From Swiss-Prot:
Glycans are attached at N45, N108, N472. Residues 467-483, 725-736, 746-760, 785-805 have a biased composition (Polar residues). Residues 349-363, 484-493, 831-841 have a biased composition (Basic and acidic residues). It is found in: Membrane. It is a multi-pass membrane protein. Keywords: Glycoprotein, Leucine-rich repeat, Membrane, Phosphoprotein, Repeat, Transmembrane, Transmembrane helix. The gene is Lrrc66. Gene3D superfamilies: Ribonuclease Inhibitor. Residues 339-363, 467-501, 560-579, 695-761, 776-872 are annotated as: Disordered. LRR repeats lie at residues 142-164, 165-186, 189-210, 213-234, 239-259. Its main location: membrane. SMART domains: LRR_TYP (SM00369). GO terms for cellular component: membrane. This is Leucine-rich repeat-containing protein 66. It comes from Mus musculus (Mouse).
Length: 872
């Protein structure tokens, strides 16, 4: 804003003193207009000479002054020099206003569109003529160079003879048509005349007569057709260099006669000119061969040097006028470089196509497009880098929050709404084949199933460790994690079936269809599905399970302790085994009698329970017990044999010995309670949140599985004998015969349906005691099984108790008793069956492990071998 105010002030001041500016003195005008001053000589570039008043010229200068004032600072530096009026339009020019400039040497009036230029003025009055005396005829006495190129002149300037010091005259690029006799008369100091690119068609032969110092005449690109005047000029001035290219020469036969008169050198020149005229027929065309020759119109070298150079060139033959002119131009350029730099030349003054200054000015323009692209790319990279640097911490923070919010076991969690809650069942689960749990979901087996679908038995030690760690919790080195305890509590609180959550090895059912299906089956639906299935197909599987349970229960010490040899054996055989497949045989005794009664009612021929009891004797019951003990005795040798081979033998033997009368006689519909009987009440689930002793009375009979049998009194006596033998040994080891003996002790007499309700009340305490001692896990893969009984009087061995292997397709043998059936109910979680009621009541009992063999199995290895051979 401050600069703006200053400029306004200067503008107002200049307008106020317009009078002063319009009438400057001579001295001030001369000092304002000079462009350069060198060695005391004043060099003035007067381009405002016109036939107008001095006031108009002064106003033009004042306008230029104010225009420079209001331009930006960057443009002011360009206009520090005096104005260059090379492009102003001037119609007529005279040198009278410049007559007082005695020191003027160079006058450049190019590109002014001048139509007329004259130095001849009418004589002043006599008084004025007397005042100036002899100086009246002398105008611009020191002017040496006059440049009038690129104008509209139709003829040579008039009165050139008055310029006594003129050495170079440039009239190129005009419209000159004719050169007369007196055009250059009296210019005795003239050395070079440039008439290039005009329309000259005729030249007077004596036009250059008397110009003894004339060295260069450029007549290129004109309309000349004949060489007669040129030859005349050349003869008069033998040292003269002529530029005759690009003319319309007519090389006819008449010129041949003229060539015979001239010398050989002129003949060669004539031939060269004729050849060039044939190639270039356009009269006004320019060539680049003598483009540099125009630089020679300002010469500072002495005339003697130029004469010697021209004479040496003139002696050569037709080496051509163009060659002489180009060489002369090079020499003159070196000597005249200082003089040429004394005044600025506009790029328009040299209008030919090869102007170097115009080319250099174009090259100086900055590449705006390339610069913009480079800047945009650089800015893009910088912005991207800044965004990445600032956004990286926020991205890392969001990723950490996402990882922290994600639960570690969410990927391996196994959730099923059929169970009670989400169970992380697949945390360490290794699927080696088709799981036994999966087979019970699709258990629609028939008698003609392939016997190769055999369940491989598991080593016996894993069930013992799982039960001890899952229910006892007294081992300080094997404490349950909070997640496992929570899953155990949730599984016990309802009737849901819990998959093992620890490292479990599953039974692989080879070739069983629909083995990969995972479905949620409720306990009621599971119970009904078992009634629709053929129970003959799973006897071999129950053999392996019972054998494994009995073997582990025999070596399990009280309060969860067991020998180190068994611990090592458990580690060698298998790292982990399922806890919910151990008690499948114990559940086979509940459904059979009920289904028998249902089948009788459906067929219309009900069989009384008394008749069923009459078919069974006490001897047969003992045979069943002895058969189980024999299987427990044969466990060591049974484990050494291939699982598939042993089960195939058992399958074939049982399949061929099954009597047709023992096959199921009920339909395939859902389970329906007989009309003559009352529905049996379900036991309540066991609640592990309370103490075992305090919860003893309030615990439901969920895990107590009742079966219908007529041999309750005899089985009660065998149970009392086995408990007495265990107490005499001073241990609190649980009886392993709960799967057969205890459940048969708790069986009510089925003489009538009304006796079932009355008999359940006194048997509830015994069932709860057995439930606390020996409740086994029953998963969703529990199935209806029947026991294979044989005649053997040996008692159950506490050490050799194991789970009986289950074989699909197995049928009831003729040794089995009709009344001994097991009913397996889905139970929540395994309750520690290693304790008896006496252990809970008297905690000070000795907890030393029981001897590996009981008194009933001290007969020796021969008897056991005999029993094994008898069984197989």
């Amino acid at each position: 804003m401050r600069d703006f105010y200053v400029r306004v002030t200067i503008l107002v001041t200049g307008l106020c003193f317009v009078e002063t500016v319009t009438t400057p003195s001579r001295k001030s005008s001369v000092s304002f207009n000079p462009e350069y001053q060198r060695n005391g000589d004043l060099l003035v570039n007067w381009s405002s000479i016109r036939h107008v008043s001095q006031n108009t010229d002064a106003m033009d200068r004042s306008f230029y002054f104010f225009r420079v004032l209001f331009q930006p600072h960057t443009q002011k530096e360009r206009h520090i020099k005096p104005p260059d009026r090379t492009h102003h339009r001037i119609s007529k020019v005279t040198l009278d206003p410049l007559a007082h400039l005695h020191a003027l040497e160079i006058l450049n009036l190019s590109n002014k569109a001048i139509h007329y230029f004259s130095l001849d003025q009418p004589l002043p009055p006599s008084s004025h003529q007397k005042r100036h005396g002899g100086h009246s005829h002398s105008r611009l006495p020191r002017l040496q160079v006059l440049i009038l190129q690129r104008n509209q002149l139709s003829g040579t300037p008039k009165g050139l003879w008055k310029l006594k010091s003129l050495r170079s005259l440039d009239l190129s690029f005009n419209r000159i048509v004719h050169i007369g006799l007196s055009d250059f008369h009296g210019c005795l100091q003239l050395e070079s005349i440039y008439l290039k690119s005009n329309k000259i068609c005729t030249i007077h032969p004596k036009a250059f007569k008397g110009l003894k110092k004339l060295q260069v005449v450029d007549l290129r690109s004109n309309a000349l057709t004949t060489l007669v005047p040129i030859v005349t000029i050349a003869l008069e001035l033998p040292h003269l260099e002529l530029g005759l290219a690009d003319n319309q020469w007519q090389c006819s036969e008449s010129n041949v006669n003229f060539q015979n008169i001239t010398s050989s050198s002129w003949r060669e020149i004539w031939k060269a000119i004729c050849n060039m005229s044939v190639e270039n027929k356009r009269p006004n065309a320019e060539t680049h061969q003598i483009r540099k020759s125009r630089d020679t119109h300002l010469l500072l070298s002495p005339p003697s040097d130029l004469k010697s150079l021209i004479q040496s060139k003139a002696e050569r033959p037709q080496a051509g006028m163009d060659m002489h002119l180009s060489a002369l131009g090079k020499e003159a350029k070196d000597g005249y470089g200082d003089l040429r730099g004394m005044w600025p030349q506009s790029p328009v003054e040299l209008r030919d196509s090869q102007d170097e200054q115009v080319t250099d000015r174009k090259d100086d323009k900055p590449p705006a497009l390339e610069l913009a692209i480079c800047l945009s790319v650089f800015i893009t990279f910088v912005v991207a880098f800044c965004l990445g640097a600032f956004a990286r911490p926020y991205i890392d923070r969001l990723r950490q929050q996402r990882c922290s919010n994600k639960r570690p076991g969410s990927d391996n969690a196994y959730s099923n709404k059929g169970f009670h809650g989400d169970i992380e069942g697949a945390q360490h689960m290794e699927y080696q084949g088709t799981d036994l749990h999966q087979t019970t979901h699709h258990l629609h087996l028939s008698e003609n199933q392939n016997p190769s679908w055999v369940a491989e038995p598991i080593p016996h030690s894993a069930v013992q460790s799982e039960q001890m760690l899952g229910s006892n919790g007294t081992d300080p080195g094997h404490q349950q994690s909070p997640e496992q305890l929570k899953d155990s509590n949730e599984s016990r609180s309802g009737d849901s079936i819990v998959l093992p959550s620890g490292p479990v090895a599953h039974l692989a059912l080879h070739g069983l269809p629909n083995a990969d299906a995972h479905k949620a089956i409720s306990p009621v639906q599971h119970h009904h599905d078992f009634l629709e299935e053929a129970h003959y197909d799973t006897v071999a599987q129950e053999y392996s399970l019972i054998d494994d349970v009995m073997d582990r229960s025999s070596i399990t010490g009280p309060l969860g302790t067991f020998p180190s040899s068994v611990e090592s054996r458990r580690d060698d055989l298998h790292p982990s085994q399922p806890r919910d497949v151990v008690a499948s045989f114990s559940k086979t005794l509940a459904h059979a009698n009920t289904r028998e009664a249902e089948g009788s009612m459906e067929t219309g021929c009900p069989e009384p329970l008394g008749a069923m009891d009459s078919q069974m004797g006490s001897s047969e019951e003992r045979q069943v017990s002895n058969s189980i003990r024999e299987l427990a005795t044969q466990q060591p040798s049974f484990q050494g044999v291939d699982a598939e081979e042993r089960l195939s033998h058992v399958y074939s033997e049982v399949l061929h010995n099954d009597p047709p009368s023992l096959r199921p006689r009920w339909g395939s519909g859902h389970y329906v309670i007989p009309a003559t009987g009352e529905p049996v009440e379900r036991d309540a689930p066991f609640d592990p949140h309370y103490d075992l002793v305090t919860n003893y009375e309030s615990d439901s009979d969920e895990g107590s599985l009742f079966t219908l049998s007529s041999e309750g009194s005899e089985d009660t006596r065998s149970l009392a004998e086995e408990q007495a033998s265990v107490e005499n040994d001073g241990t609190s080891q649980p009886l392993p015969s709960r799967n057969l003996g205890e459940y048969k002790d708790s069986v009510t007499s089925a003489e009538s349906v009304e006796d079932l309700t009355s008999q359940r009340i006194p048997e509830k305490c015994e069932a709860q005691e057995a439930h606390l001692r020996n409740t086994l896990i029953s998963g969703p893969d529990s199935c209806v099984c029947e026991t294979n009984q044989e005649n053997d009087s040996s008692s159950l061995d506490p050490e050799n108790r194991s789970t009986w292997p289950q074989l699909p397709g197995h049928k009831l043998s003729h040794h089995e008793t009709l009344g001994t059936y097991g009913d397996i109910e889905p139970q929540s979680e395994a309750v520690d069956w290693h304790y008896s009621l006496r252990d809970l009541e008297s905690p000070n009992v000795d907890s030393s492990p029981s001897p590996p063999y009981s008194d009933e199995d001290l007969s020796g290895p021969e008897d056991r071998a005999r029993k094994r051979s008898k069984h197989w």
